[in-house]
UniProtKB/Swiss-Prot annotation:
Compartments where found: Nucleus; Chromosome; Nucleus, Nuclear body
Traits of the deletion mutant: RNAi-mediated knockdown has minimal effects on development and worms reach adulthood, but are sterile. Sterility is primarily caused by a defect in the sperm/oocyte switch producing hermaphrodites without oocytes and with more sperm. Slightly lower global transcript levels, while constitutive splicing remains unaltered, in larval stages L3 and L4. Modifies the distribution of RNA polymerase II subunit ama-1 along chromatin. Significant overlap (q<0.05) in the transcripts down-regulated by knockdown of pre-mRNA-splicing factor 8 homolog prp-8.
Protein name: SRRM2 protein homolog rsr-2
Disulfide bonds: none
């Protein structure tokens, strides 16, 4: 189904559902729609050349006259005249305006508004009349009438006729050129035989004249170059003489004045790197050094981590605790810690392990009355040092005692539960 045509489903129809055109139906020939045909053009021309209604135009002109009469009446009222005098004068003014309009002295068409269709048509007609008068066309002329009389065959024939005289003119010019060339060739052939001997002599003379001219030109150029060099040398000599005179006239005190001026000049700052500044920078770097790998220290400050970098403002706004860390004592302690060798670390690790083992080796006996008394009186336990054999025996006994204590704890719990039940009864 396509655009509402055909079956919704091909099921049960015995077909594939393909919609095929009815080839037995005869299609009527479609008429071509002629846009901007002759009828349309005539209608458009009629609308453009439509003349305004003169009755409506006269009515609008009279309205403009009444507007002028009302304005005149308002002026008389402002002056304070009577109603009878005002009516009489306004009536006379109206009659004069109507007479001028009929005679053509008064033109009110310019005052009419262009919003009205008749006023616009009137203005368009006036413009067309001006154009017709400028081109010298009569009032009976219809635009396009001259082309309607011409046929296509006439147009083609006129064009061909205009091209024929041009072709004839071209052929005539070509013939005249050919004749002129032939006459030239004949003259050259006749004169060549007579002037062959004279031409050889003239050619040799021409070569001599050319060589003489070149030699003269070279000599003139060399003379000009020598003159310029002499002028430059004279100028140099004059300048040297003037400089010698100035040196002789100058007093000997000028050297002293120059020395005094040099002394008065302010000493310029030496912008080169001083040794003191470099020492200060090295001291700062030593202070900033932190426990890091040497690879991290060798890197440039841009490649280091963010924690490694710290701007100057943050350094200035640090708390006093940070200043304590910067103290030389703390710095030495850090260096000792991180510069210690592996043997010291191992020794400290073994010592810590031994201390832990000794703490575990303290005798763990079951609580008794004496221990309760010690706990109440806050007396510290006594540490007993034993040999390796005694330590193994004590471990075995502690394991046995722990198993026995667990059994005794279970029995004591059962007895305590039975006692509590009897008490409750």
């Amino acid at each position: 189904m396509y655009n509402g045509i055909g079956l919704q489903t091909a099921r049960g129809s015995g077909t594939n559902g393909y919609v095929q055109s009815n080839l037995s139906h005869l299609m009527q020939a479609r008429r071509k729609i002629e846009y901007n045909g002759e009828d349309d053009l005539r209608k458009m021309e009629a609308e453009l050349n439509r003349k305004p209604n003169e009755e409506i135009m006269d009515h609008n002109r009279k309205r403009q006259i009444e507007v002028k009469c009302t304005e005149f009446e308002m002026l008389l009222e402002d002056k304070g005249l009577d109603d009878e005098d005002i009516e009489r004068k306004v009536g006379e003014y109206r009659k004069n305006l109507l007479k001028q309009l009929e005679s053509g002295e008064l033109n009110v068409d310019e005052e009419l508004s262009t919003k009205e269709s008749h006023a616009r048509r009137r203005a368009a007609a006036n413009n067309r009349d001006k154009m017709r008068n400028a081109l010298g066309l009569g009032e009976d002329y219809v635009p396009g009438s001259s082309m309607a009389k011409m046929n296509k065959s006439d147009v083609v024939g006129a064009a061909m006729e205009s091209e024929l005289p041009q072709k004839d003119d071209k052929e005539k010019l070509l013939e005249t050129l050919r004749l002129h060339r032939k006459s030239k060739k004949k003259q050259e052939s006749s004169s060549s035989s007579s002037s062959s001997s004279s031409s050889s002599e003239s050619s040799s003379e021409d070569e001599k004249h050319r060589k003489d001219r070149k030699k003269k030109e070279k000599k003139q150029k060399l003379k000009e170059m020598e003159k310029r060099r002499e002028k430059l040398r004279q100028k140099e000599r004059e300048l040297l003489a003037v400089s010698d005179k100035v040196k002789k006239e100058e007093p000997a005190e000028s050297s002293d004045e120059e020395d005094s001026r040099k002394d008065q000049r302010k000493p310029r700052e030496d912008r080169r790197r001083s040794v003191e500044r470099q020492d200060q920078r090295e001291d700062r770097r030593d202070r900033r050094r932190s426990p890091e790998d040497p690879r991290e220290r060798r890197r440039s400050p841009e490649d280091r981590t963010v924690r490694r970098r710290s701007p100057e403002r943050r350094r200035q706004q640090r708390s006093p605790s940070v200043e304590r860390r910067k103290s030389p004592q703390r710095r030495d302690e850090r260096r000792r810690r991180h510069d210690s060798s592996e043997n010291e670390r191992r020794s400290t690790a073994t010592a810590s392990k031994k201390s832990r083992m000794d703490e575990l080796e303290v005798k763990q006996e079951p609580p008794s009355d004496s221990e309760d008394y010690i706990a109440k009186t806050n007396l510290a336990p006594i540490r007993v040092e034993k040999s390796a054999e005694k330590v193994e025996k004590s471990r075995k006994s502690s394991s046995e005692s722990s198993s026995g204590s667990s059994d005794s704890d279970s029995s004591s719990d059962s007895s305590s539960s039975s006692d509590s039940s009897s008490d409750s009864e």
